[in-house]
Amino acid sequence: MTFLSRWLRLQPGEGSRAGWMVLYSLAAVGGVIITGSLVGRALFLSALPAEAIPYKYLLPPLVLIVVSALYARLAARWSRPRLIYIVCVLSAVGILSTRWLLSVESHSFTLLCGLYVFIDVISALVILQFWTFAGDLFTAREARRVFPLITAGSTLSNLVFGLGLSAVASSVDPGDLLLIMVGSLVVIAGVTVRLAPETISASTDNESRQSRPPSRIDLRTHPLLPTIAGLVLLVTIISNIADYQLDLALQRHYGDDGRGMLAFLGSFRFWSGLGACALQFLVARRLLERFGVGAGLLLLPVAIAGGSMAILLTGGALWAVSVPRGSDVVLKYTIHDASLNLLFLPIPDSLRASAKAWIDGILRPPVAAALALMFLWVGPETTPQAWAIPVLVLVMVWMWL
């Protein structure tokens, strides 16, 4: 056992798998999710009016309902690696096609909405596949040691990609940065090729593909799923409100300056990533091992509540509006996701992937769409501080659960 493995308290055989999954996490979260969301947001907000903002919350969940329903069926029949390869190839083709279209018409509402929807769907599938694949690689006992470690890729990606995007924002067209997503998808496929033979369920793939897909009754009656679903839905509502608050503040501050907006968002990701690094490497692992999943899930609502109070006290200053979203960045892809996915481990492997697809693709999108309709109804004239009040109420409900 190497010094690094002893320092990280990894058992023999865990180090190689954990290292490859850190790379997978870096590519998925940094190269696909962060790059896609920042570039898509800058293109959207700098080219379209404030009245269009609610559509970037309304359209993605509606499309995700259809995509997730299809994915849930395929997940019960095809192996996880095969699904990862298909998603990577189709996503890369779509991104390259969209980049060409942006060179023709960069202010099209249809194209920019389509791009945002496409990026959102890709991001949802990529992170879903990351965690289900990680669940196939590690037992429940191994996961308690390894899951906080493999999320280090998510933490580092905020630093690396946030700083990188901020540095090049003033000299590179935002649309060209979409090519980073293509390269990251290639990395994801490569890591999957390397680790596919080591999955715990590799020997039972043929049986799982031929077995009956879990029914809705199976999904609804498992004792853990209602609690997990409730947490996911609350996180969705609060995160989307925080994101909408930031959209309103960004557009009022930067207007049509897409490069300035991207530079700010890159810096925002960098500083959030710095906080996430401190949490990930100094706190997360020991917190989960000593106090368990409950403590890990409690940090995010407390941080968002503090950010909402800052919005109210400062009258909606840009830095204050960034705090709830920053809390989401610091905690969601680190200790919160690790804690939430530990809750999935007692669920049988035959049910786990379909359960995640059911929660993320069937339950969550209608809730997000309903919230977007509320954004449309209220209108962009509503200030970020007005939205801070319902966030505080929802956080109290979250902590009660």
What do these predicted regions represent?
Residues I86-I95, G175-R194, L298-L300, W319, ...:
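Symmetry-related core transmembrane helices of the 12-TM Major Facilitator Superfamily/SLC fold
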Residues M1-E14, S203-A229:
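Juxtamembrane intracellular "pre-TM" segments in multi-pass secondary transporters
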Residues V89-S108, A284, L300-G316:
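C-terminal ends and interior cores of transmembrane alpha-helices
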Residues A76-L90, S171-L177, L282-V302:
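Cytoplasmic membrane-interface "Motif A"-like loop-to-helix N-cap segments
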Residues A18-Y71, L111-A169, R209-D218, V232-A284, ...:
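Substrate-agnostic recognition of the 12-TM MFS/MFS-like secondary transporter fold
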Residues W100-Y116, L195-T199, A310-R325:
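Helix-loop junctions at membrane interfaces in 12-TM secondary transporters
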